[in-house]
Every structure is written in structure tokens, then in C-alpha cells.
Amino acid sequence: MNFQWYPGHMTKAKRQMQEDIKLIDLVIELVDARIPLSSRNPDIDELGKNKYRLILMNKADLADRKATEQWSAFFKKKGYYVVSLDARSKNGMKSITDIIMEACKEKMERDRKRGIKNRPVRAMVVGIPNVGKSTFINSYAGKACAKTGNKPGVTKGKQWIRLSKSVELLDTPGILWPKFEDQKVGLRLALIGSIRDEILNTDELAVELIRFLKTQYPGILTERYEVEETQKETELLCGIAENRKCITKGGELDYSKAAALLIDEFRGGKLGKITLEWPQVQAE
């Protein structure tokens, strides 16, 4: 299955970010804690070079806690400031302002020596579609400053948000990159909802998810759907359809409905806390 989604507005958004980065002290990059590496746009490292960097691993409530701890150590070792959080419940949000100040302390000291007082840290918030940038900004600012939605591509245009005397945020549209060199990256992005479902083969996506869960989280499908995990992936999807009574009007099993149900329940955390990639595997 081939994954690719790079609509024209993303090219325009990237050009705007390249222009706006000149105004920025700090790049705050949101990633999905279930796929912390695959949900990083590789263009951001080039865009944000010579800028202070903070990685926020959002949706940590849906991710495997041990994996999140390992990813946090992985990124810190590479020189990033890192926070794991759940922007929706605000869990993990309290420390962010202090970490922003810590990350930018050299800049603030330079300002002080130059006699520049009370100039706020300017941070650009970046991330791929559907990682929760708008929800993070709304939670952080304490009010609905940015549009939110559960479909990739909702936030558009330039938005500066003054959080306090100390911090200003520039929200940016979620952008992917033109080509996924590794189709496993595309698969993971599709599973978390960063690629529009309308262009995906949901049945094949569900089969890939079942294959992963059988090997990495054995027993989770049996517990949720009362299926026998020794079966083939397609047979397991059939079992899920039977368990959840996914039936067509003609009385046949509705595999597409079962596939969509499985993916939705994974995305919503109903299967448990699951991470789709681990740092030690990436290093091999």
C-alpha cells in the first residue's frame, strides 16, 4: 500500500514558515507520542537550525509509557528539550513556560546585556496534521485562540498568540513532506490520522494494524474482540466484524465497517496504551 498526501496548500505553508522563522527564537515541535520519530517532519530540522528547540510529545495518554520514557531520553540525548503531555487534559502542561525560559536563557541574557528589556520569547509551533497543535495552544493559552478539529488541515493562516509578557507563539498549519522515503512511516501516519482517510484503503490499513498488534501487543485483540490471534490477519478482521456485528444490508459481514471501527478504537485509545515505534528499533 502506497501512502502519500501533499496538497498544494502545504507547499505555500512551508514557504511562509521559511519566511517567518527569521522572527523566531524557539521552535516548538509537536509530535505524536505513539510515533515520535515518524511524526517529525524532516524539513523542520533544516528550517529550525540555529534556533532553540523543544519537542512536545503530545497524546502521551494514548502511548505506551515505557516507550515514551525511552523516546524522551532519545531526544534529550540529541540535544532537544523534551516534554511529554496530553494537551486535551492539560496533563504535563505546567512545566512548559519554565522549560521555554530555560531553553532560551542565552538569548534572554544577550538581550539583557544589550539593554533590551521585556522582549518576549517568540516561539513557532510546528507539527504535522492532527498532532494536536491547536489543542495545545488552546490549553496553554487558557482560551480558544486557534481553530481545532479532528481532521488534518483545519488550522490555516498566520496566528500570533500573546501568552504573557514572556512568551508569544506563532501557530502554523500542519504540513507533511513531499515524499515518504520509508512507506512504514506513511503507514504509521495513516494509522494515527495524519493522512486523510478518504484517500486510504481502510481494509488494508486495518490488516497492517492487526499484524503489528499480534506481534508487539499479543493478547490485546483477544481481550477486546474475543478473537483467536493465531488466525491470519484477514480472518481476525472477520472475527472482529462478527464480534461487533458489522453486517451489510444483505446480511454479509461488513469488513470495511469492521476495519474502520478497529482503526477508530486504536486512535481513541480503546485498545490500550500503544506505541507503534520504539527508539531502539530505529537505531538498528
Which ranges hold each PLM region?
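Helix-rich effector regions associated with P-loop NTPase G domains
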Residues: 1-26, 34-43, 47-53, 66, ...
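Anionic group-transfer/hydrolysis microenvironments
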Residues: 31-34, 60, 140, 173
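Active-site cofactor/substrate anionic-group-binding motifs, chiefly glycine-
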Residues: 51-61
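Short, structured loop/turn "capping" segments at alpha-beta junctions
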Residues: 107-111, 138, 144-150, 216-221
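Glycine-rich phosphate-binding P-loop
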Residues: 122-142, 146, 172
